[in-house]
Amino acid sequence: MQHSIVEYLSEHEGYRCGYCGSPDSNFSHGMWAHNLTCQDYQDLIDRGWRRSGKYVYKPTMDKMCCPQYTIRCHAPSLKVKKSQKKVLKKATKFFTTGEKPGGEGGVQHDGEDAPGGVHPMPPSHQELPQMPMEDISKIQGGVQESEGGARVAKGQSDVEGQSDVKGQLDVRVPSEHGGLEGKRAGTSGESPATVSIEKQKRIPKPGLGADPTKPPCKKSKLLRLEKRQERLKQKANTESSEANIRPSNSSKTENSPKSLEEFIVDAIPGQDPKHQLEIKLIRTNPPSQEYINTEKESHKVYEKYQTFVHNDPPDECALFEYKRFLVDSPLVEQYSDDGPECGYGSFHQHYVLDGKIIAVGVIDILPTCVSSVYFYYDPEYRHLTLGTFSALRELAFTRLLNVTAPSLEYYYMGFYVHSCRKMRYKGQFYPSYLLCPEAYIFQPIEDCLPRLDVNKYSRFASEDESDAAVSLEEVLVLHKHIAMPYPVYKQYRPQAADEEEVKEYAQMAGKKCVGQMLLYRN
């Protein structure tokens, strides 16, 4: 089992706000994520966290100048509005005729209101976390659990030197006598030497190969594909049966609103397009070969965008900064039998026009959503209103994934800032929901806006709904390569004056996450 590993960086305060321009009124709490499972990150963004590279931050909503509310849209239920149809039709006309709309060259939803929104840059090298790189390399395999999933072990009680096996961690719990009890997670109590000998006995001799009496084992990718095809077949049969028994209603069909997909067309019917747009999905962590092949080109687009739209100096747009901000990711590449074929994790979507990258959408594909991280484009194509256009295309992509992964049904647009005029367009995607900053429950945006018109910071949930309390006993930490509950860690480091910091981390990360993620302690 893989575990997320994070370092809590506490509160960062007094930095510049990217929305109102105030130099010192932005506040947030942060974590450095060495690695995150996609489920843990899903749980974090459902508590108001977002990532920028490997830096994960949570705005301090009641203190900051421009409160940032997590916003999501239920993609399968999307109702396309007139203004959004206009954006798609304008793009189709351009692809068909090649003509740019007159007088609209400067009108654009730029990167500050593009789906992902404005992010703080990851901490500089002076602020980087303290976890040694050799520790990270030893724990990439994650925590292994014993049978039944219990994090327990027996035997040695000395913390020093217990986890010298690469890719494996001990998981310790308090014994009845107050010490550490447990065996190496995932073993049955034998000594390492005994286990090694037993494993060697099971290894077939060279040259013998697989058992010819048994069929060859199928690869997990093939098994996932077969299960997905079976689900699609069953769904098609169900829809066919429903169609046979459903009474025809031609007038209703004619009057029913068009779906999003019906507005996304490559060219006006009956005309040959002047331009061809292709959207490519490219995994960035671990970097795929296609990402490596296109890294320089996509970085050049980013450089043009940042200098033109945000007036950033060229040295702040260097390849190193670009990768730290939009390529580096803590998300672990994961696959599931009932998930999308592309898997979960971090990706780029390249908008390729006539073989040339004109825009890039940075997205995370998570168990229940597609999360927009950032979007940038070549300013030459700003007339296409690419902020709204990209959001609609990412919504269409979410709807496509939902066909084979029913639990993946939401599109997260980053943050909604009611005080920022350029952000208002996010609320136009219906149905959309804002996250209550106190109860962490999503509420329909139409119920929230009247409250925000009165107060920029507002609770949306009813008073009888509250966030679950978290105790320090529930917090898992990583110390000396060993995962253990926080009270056990305190037995070994009673002098550590970090209790208030860990309490704050637990409250910010929430009950579900602190029992799954490992908080690094040096």
Which residues fall in each region the model found?
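Intrinsically disordered, low-structural-confidence terminal and linker regions
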Residues: 1-19
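A conserved beta-strand-loop-helix scaffold within acyl/acetyltransferase catalytic domains
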Residues: 4, 52-66, 71-78, 84-383, ...
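Terminal, non-catalytic protein-protein interaction segments that mediate quaternary/complex assembly
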Residues: 11, 23-26, 35-36, 53, ...
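Intrinsically disordered, low-complexity N-terminal segments that are enriched in acidic
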Residues: 15, 27, 39-43, 64-73
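Eukaryote-specific detector of the first structured module of a protein
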Residues: 18, 34-37, 46-47, 51
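A residue-level signal for conserved active-site and pocket-lining positions in enzyme catalytic cores
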Residues: 44, 302, 426
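C-terminal catalytic domain of photolyase/cryptochrome flavoproteins
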Residues: 349, 404-522
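Aromatic (often tryptophan-rich) hydrophobic motifs at membrane interfaces
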Residues: 349-433
